[in-house]
């Protein structure tokens, strides 16, 4: 999509090679190989286990079928890894790898000029989408996301960030702190919501976290985000879950975590 949708056009138009991390290249190839005419079995299972009503699931699948995404035609690439240094014109750029939002999101940092091409990994006002997906339903992307924020904090104070959405900004450390606080608030909100309901599906938790969703595209993103937060709380021992006889996963707060003050 907006990560690599123009890769083929740029490489063909300018006669240049594609530089990319391995994880992003493989993800691009995998998404490009999937057909959108029929939902994949793993997608059907993912939504069924979430408890989302079937008519709402069908609207999500229909939105995916209508998606105009055309996968890049890329069979070769040059691999970027964390710590690599690229010399582009007068500047040297260090490769920083971010995870959570995308498998191996490449950021470029020029320490000498205090410049960070942050992409989707660090945005000035909105928060990057961090979600569990149907092809990795047991994933815990928020743990990877927080580790990536730690790496971004190594950038010097006063670094100018060039994000992929909205305006350029300064204040890497302050923004990282805001993002951590945002997710901490969501963890606390989810813990109380699940405790109040007793047994809670991911869909019910989604409606509690995001009560004003508009359309199937937002349902898709919000459900993935909700499951990511539920998975993180499971890893921390705050929640447990069970696949019940109706094929739906339901979450409970672990008894010892009901009234405990949490330190995220």
Where are these regions (language model features)?
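Short, acidic/polar N-cap/turn motifs at the starts of alpha helices
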Residues: 82-85, 105, 238
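C-terminal regulatory/interaction regions
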Residues: 189-264
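Feature marks short, surface-exposed loop/turn motifs that line or immediately flank catalytic pockets
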Residues: 26, 123-125, 170, 209, ...
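A structural signal for the main folded, soluble domain(s) of proteins
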Residues: 10, 14-17, 78, 90, ...
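Short polar/acidic secondary-structure junctions
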Residues: 85, 98-100, 244
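Metallo-beta-lactamase
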Residues: 59-75, 92-187
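Aromatic/hydrophobic pocket-lining residues that form the small-molecule binding cavity
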Residues: 4, 145, 226
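Active-site HxH/HxHxD metal-binding segment of metal-dependent hydrolases
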Residues: 1-86, 114, 175-177
